[in-house]
């Protein structure tokens, strides 16, 4: 099945977030077991980097939903004739 930008699949979007969060959780579990509480700066930078990517993805998803919502309101108003 071909992917298209004309239709957004919100289920795939939320599944992508879920997979990424699970990856970060797995990273945290490995970190906890391998370091026994001692963490170096490189590890903390890696974790911060992954969290930042997640935040940016969530922000982009939110912006898409806001744009869709605004467009739906515009379409409803034009259909109503106001």
Curated annotation (Swiss-Prot):
Top-level taxon of the source organism: Bacteria
Family statement: Belongs to the chlamydial CPn_0710/CT_666/TC_0037 family.
Protein name: Uncharacterized protein TC_0037
């Amino acid at each position: 099945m071909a992917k298209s930008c004309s239709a957004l699949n919100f289920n795939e979007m939320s599944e992508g977030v879920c997979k990424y969060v699970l990856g970060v959780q797995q990273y945290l579990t490995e970190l906890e077991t391998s370091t026994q509480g001692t963490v170096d700066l490189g590890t903390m930078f890696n974790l911060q980097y992954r969290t930042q990517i997640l935040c940016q993805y969530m922000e982009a998803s939110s912006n898409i939903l806001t744009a869709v919502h605004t467009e739906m309101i515009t379409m409803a108003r034009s259909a109503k004739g106001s």
